[in-house]
């Protein structure tokens, strides 16, 4: 039995578990699990159901066990701008509001009252997009 490595890719509309292995110097990739993904809406707020996402991650790992291919390591790739706030006991505070939610509308102007757009870019190198984390954080501050 060879060594297996699991990559979990969670995108905005689907997620998948890909097992990788080496055989005769070649990389083999096998999709072992796929699931639907998308934001939920509650009271006009778009958010990620992180509990469901966690359940999907576990389901894909169970699938690896079912087919007898236990990974030695796991890597997870997700979208890069959303976040959850945690309390001192690492419990999630509120919803994991998604980047497509409209709470960031106008938050660029609020951020630029603190730091200019040019200075922000010089410090981060991140292209301006209204869904970037800094605007989500400003929206949280304003709520």
Language model features with spans:
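N-terminal glycine/serine-rich phosphate-binding loop of ATP-dependent small-molecule kinases
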Residues: 1-95, 122
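Intrinsically disordered, low-complexity boundary segments flanking structured domains
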Residues: 22-23, 141-143
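Glycine-rich phosphate-binding loop and adjoining helix at the ATP-binding site
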Residues: 84-142
């Amino acid at each position: 039995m060879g060594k297996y490595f699991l990559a979990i890719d969670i995108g905005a509309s689907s997620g998948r578990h890909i097992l990788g292995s080496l055989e005769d110097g070649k990389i083999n990739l096998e999709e072992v699990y796929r699931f639907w993904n998308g934001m939920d809406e509650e009271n006009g707020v778009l958010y990620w159901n992180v509990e469901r996402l966690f359940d999907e991650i576990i389901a894909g790992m169970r699938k690896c066990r079912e087919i007898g291919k236990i990974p030695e390591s796991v890597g997870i790739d997700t979208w890069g701008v959303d976040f959850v706030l945690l309390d001192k006991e690492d419990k999630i505070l509120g919803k994991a509001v998604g980047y497509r939610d409209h709470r960031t509308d106008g938050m660029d102007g609020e951020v630029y009252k603190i730091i200019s757009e040019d200075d922000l870019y010089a410090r981060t190198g991140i292209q301006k997009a209204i869904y970037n984390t800094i605007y989500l954080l400003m929206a949280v501050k304003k709520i």
